[in-house]
Amino acid sequence: MAKRLRISPDEPIFALHRIRYMDDIPALVEYTYIPATYFPHVEEQDFSMLSLYDYMKKYNRISTDFHQKLTIMKCPKKEAKYLNIVSKDDSIFYFEYLGRTNKGEVVEYTRAYYKSEAVQFRFNQYYADF
């Protein structure tokens, strides 16, 4: 994980694991990792009451640039349990993303498993003039 966050292996990492609900139905399981040295006392925060990005903003280390990867895959057993997915053949949306500040500091790595019937994604794509 230190390699993904571009920190030394001996630096502390804070892990935030959450199940997100939409209309009282579990919609996604999210695993977020941030360099603890950038965020003093992060382990004392109640992120059920506080937005992670609001907290990061306090320390002027908010993600402004995201490198994202989307994969459609079968749901792993552990996440299927959290998402109440019964069929082992159900597919989910798996996102991996790395968040960087405007200074290029990596401040977040997240893996998220989205229940496919609970979410919808829309994308806009723009091309620069050639």
Model-identified regions with their sequence ranges:
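C-terminal all-alpha effector/ligand-binding and dimerization domain
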Residues: 1-130
